[in-house]
From Swiss-Prot:
NCBIfam families: arch_S11P, PRK09607.1
Organism of this sequence: Metallosphaera sedula (strain ATCC 51363 / DSM 5348 / JCM 9185 / NBRC 15509 / TH2)
Job description of the protein: Located on the platform of the 30S subunit.
GO-annotated biological processes: translation
Protein name: Small ribosomal subunit protein uS11
One GO CC annotation: ribosome
Similarity-based family: Belongs to the universal ribosomal protein uS11 family.
A molecular function (GO) term: structural constituent of ribosome
UniProt KW keywords: Ribonucleoprotein, Ribosomal protein, RNA-binding, rRNA-binding
UniProt cross-references to InterPro entries, sorted A to Z: Ribosomal_uS11, Ribosomal_uS11_archaeal, Ribosomal_uS11_CS, Ribosomal_uS11_sf
Length: 132
């Protein structure tokens, strides 16, 4: 008898801003966090937090923790700050996705979940702008 092992799916959420990259791997419902890591946890200097190298290290750490806990396949959701901030992901998004793919996961789908306003939104700083 060949007993086929059921594949355990999860969600990898990548938040890539200009200041940091945060990777959170949850179960398929998103309710239980299995592992998380950020670029700031991997490097010493603050200026290196948003770097692609820090994002790659963070994705490797989160992936190894999730693989140890039995996760085999993931769907990836990439998010930029959005809203009043930039709508494009930061420099760590691509290396994080590549690192998750190389770590041995089965990749289901990759989607962008950046919040985009459907009307205009008021920028921070007020009517007279940011006074320096």
């Amino acid at each position: 008898m060949s007993s086929k092992r059921e594949i355990r799916w999860g969600l990898a959420r990548i938040y890539a801003s200009q200041n940091n990259t945060i990777i959170t791997i949850t179960d398929i419902t998103g309710a239980e966090v299995i592992s998380k890591a950020s670029g700031g946890m991997m490097v010493k200097a603050d200026r290196e937090k948003p770097s692609p190298y820090a994002a790659m290290l963070a994705a490797n750490k989160a992936a190894s923790d999730a693989l140890d806990k039995g996760l085999m396949a993931i769907h990836i959701k990439v998010r930029a700050p959005g809203g009043a901030g930039p709508k494009t992901p930061g420099p760590g998004a691509q290396p994080a996705i590549r690192s998750l793919a190389r770590s041995g996961f089965i990749i289901g789908r990759i989607e962008d979940v950046t919040p985009i306003p459907h009307d205009t939104i008021r920028r921070p700083g007020g009517r007279r702008g940011r006074r320096v």
